Amino acid sequence: MKQTQRHNGIIELVKQQGYVSTEELVEHFSVSPQTIRRDLNELAEQNLILRHHGGAALPSSSVNTPWHDRKATQTEEKERIARKVAEQIPNGSTLFIDIGTTPEAVAHALLNHSNLRIVTNNLNVANTLMVKEDFRIILAGGELRSRDGGIIGEATLDFISQFRLDFGILGISGIDSDGSLLEFDYHEVRTKRAIIENSRHVMLVVDHSKFGRNAMVNMGSISMVDAVYTDAPPPVSVMQVLTDHHIQLELC
């Protein structure tokens, strides 16, 4: 097989799988690891893939849009979603609030509530809510991501697992056509799973741009949540998953 054909084949595999390891490519193309590494380096130089130690992924599915850009997009939609979610949270509730700009919008919408107890791994959420003297804000320990104020890591997982709260407000980077929830950071996925496991009622908050958006880490099925809050009807295939699993859908 010529190098050009192999390069095209690598790109196609990465598109299909989101991420592909060097070992898989060696076996698939029956060439040496050194040949595959050279191929990946050349494709990465052309910005056709993003090179990882041990493999490669699509640039669009490997690196999230910068936080400031995400914060400035779909703002009206996020505010509508946030207001609807806030209406469902009684005063005096306990809740987790996740990393993400839509969960941050929910935090803003909760400022008129009273006596909430909130556990969060999002520094921006804590900064928003700390003005409320009657709120109890519990900030998870762990590694702080300076790019978006998220807190992740083993310490975060251990911390979240100590609690059992009324609500979990969850964001996500992408939702595949089969209802798979997708993220860019494996550590963040583990934290989200911990929030799901330790919440009595999980609310997924997503604007319409997240449907069909790719990311390389599969967190699991949308059937893990109890309700989905979004601003437009999901694709038919996702709607079918929601219906099959009796997941509440709120269009905001």
Curated annotation (Swiss-Prot):
Keywords: DNA-binding, Glycerol metabolism, Repressor, Transcription, Transcription regulation
Single GO MF descriptor: ligand-modulated transcription factor activity
Keyword field contains Transcription: yes
SUPFAM superfamilies for the chain: NagB/RpiA/CoA transferase-like (SSF100950), Winged helix' DNA-binding domain (SSF46785)
Positions of the DNA-binding region: 20-39
Single GO BP term: glycerol metabolic process
Record protein name field: Glycerol-3-phosphate regulon repressor
Organism: Escherichia coli (strain K12)
